[in-house]
Amino acid sequence: VTPVLISDTGLAAEVAALINRVYSDAEKGIWLEGQSRTSEAEVAELIATGQIAVARSGDRVVGSVRVHEIEDGVGEFGMLVAAPEERGTGIGTDLVSFAENWGRERGFAQMQLELLVPQTWEHPVKEFLRGWYTRIGYRLVRKDDLETAYPFLVPHLACPCDFLVFRKILDPSK
C-alpha cells in the first residue's frame, strides 16, 4: 500500500465517508451526536488543491491523510484515517511517512499535527494516538484552548476540549 496524492475529485464521496466513519468512532463522546468531521464538498476542494493522499487496497480507499503548508518551512498533516478493518496493517504508519516525505520534498524543517482532547476525561483513542505520535518522534509544543483557536467548533462539542499541537523535526537525509 503506497499512499499517493490524488487529483480525482470523483473520489471525494468515498474519502469523506471513510473519514467520517473513522472519526465517528475515534472521537465518540467528544462531539454532539450527528456531527460529521468533514463533507464531500470540503474533501473535493482539498483534493483539487493537492492536499489529500490516499492508500488503496485494490480499488478501495483504505486510508487517507491531509497535507498542507501552515507557515514558512512547516507542513501539517491531519484527517489521518485508516479503515477499521485494515488497522494493524501499517496503513497509518505509511500515511504519516508519506506526509513527512511530502514535507521533506518541499524543504520543510518540521511537520505539525493537532490532536483534539477532552479537558476533563481521558479518551482512550486520543491517549493511544498521543503515545503513538510521541513514539514516532512528535513532541508536544503547546496546548491551545479550542474556544480561542476554533470558536466555530465549540457549539458542536459534547464536552470542553483543548487541542494539543505536536511537531517533529524533519531530517532531510531520510
Question: How should these model regions be labeled?
Answer:
Residues E42-V54, C159:
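A short helix-loop-beta-strand connector motif used in the catalytic cores of GNAT acetyltransferases and
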Residues A82, G88-E105, E127, R135:
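Conserved acetyl-CoA-binding loop-helix of GNAT-fold acetyltransferases
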Residues N20-V43:
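Conserved GNAT-fold acetyl-CoA-binding loop/helix
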Residues R130-K143:
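Conserved acetyl-CoA-binding loop of GNAT-fold acetyltransferases
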Residues E45, V74, K126, R142-C161:
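Conserved acyl-donor/pantetheine-binding loop and adjacent beta-alpha core of acyl/acetyltransferases
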Residues G103-V125:
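Conserved GNAT acetyl-CoA-binding A-motif
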Residues V1-A17:
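A short beta-loop-alpha structural element at the N-terminal edge
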Residues V54, R60-H68, V74-V81:
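Conserved beta-strand in the GNAT
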